[in-house]
Design a protein with these regions (language model features):
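Metallo-beta-lactamase
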Residues: 2-5, 99-149
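Conserved beta-strand hairpin/beta-sheet module of binuclear metal-dependent hydrolase folds
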Residues: 2-64, 151-154, 158-162
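Short, flexible loop segments at the rims of nucleotide/cofactor-binding pockets, characterized by
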Residues: 20-25, 48-50, 74-76, 136-142
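Active-site environment of divalent metal-dependent phosphoester hydrolases
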Residues: 77-82, 105-106, 145-146, 167-170
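Short acidic, glycine/serine/threonine-rich loops at helix termini
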Residues: 87, 109-112, 172-175
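Short, solvent-exposed beta-strand-terminating loops
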Residues: 160-177
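Conserved small/polar residues in nucleotide/adenosyl-binding loops
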Residues: 179-184
């Protein structure tokens, strides 16, 4: 699904889950959101739940349309956002993982055998990454959910990738309203 001309949704729907985080009923399932930004350089925003590795990697490959990703941006280490970091790194060994200091520290605990030597870009609050025409600015949002959370703002398309800052329960292909607004 295209979000903008250069941003493509690569997430997955989970219709098997009945409780999110073991406590919230989700009768309409869950959506695990991930996006691909296509520019001179490409970026993948977050991964998805571990049970959907193959589907997600296929969605990413389809969105990339034959290109290789330059970056994986990890905004949040909760497993529904990060469980496939290691699978991504294995599938795309040339890609650089972008995250903040706290995220990289947590990543070592989640994936103790994963080697990111020479493949990581540690960002600070307010720093930007230029993909071409898209400029991504990283804004730390600790305790939006977990202490390492950051959000990413694309100033070109004026899109905020909000990690767990906003959202709803429910798969995108069931009982879901898509909200759009005209900024003009």
């Amino acid at each position: 699904m295209k979000i903008t001309e250069d941003i493509i949704y690569a997430g997955v729907n989970d219709h098997q889950v009945d409780l999110f985080e073991g406590q919230y009923r989700v009768p309409n399932g869950m959506a695990y959101n991930s996006y691909v930004i296509l520019d001179e350089k490409t970026a993948v925003m977050d991964t998805v739940d571990a049970n959907f590795a193959d589907e997600w990697l296929a969605n990413v490959a389809k969105a990339l349309n034959g290109r290789k990703p330059d970056y994986l941006i990890v905004q949040h280490m909760e497993p529904d956002h990060s469980a496939n970091i290691e699978n991504f790194v294995k599938a795309y060994p040339e890609a650089t993982v972008v995250a903040n200091t706290k995220t990289f520290a947590m990543m070592k605990n989640f994936f103790p055998k994963m080697d990111l030597a020479g493949r990581k870009l540690e960002v600070k609050d307010g720093e930007s990454l230029t993909l071409g025409k898209h400029v991504l600015t990283f804004v730390f949002a600790p305790m939006v959910h977990w202490p390492e959370v950051m959000v990413t703002y694309d100033s070109t398309d004026k899109v905020l990738f909000a990690a767990d800052g906003f959202g709803k329960f429910g798969a995108l292909d069931r009982d879901c309203l898509l909200y759009t607004s005209d900024a003009a």
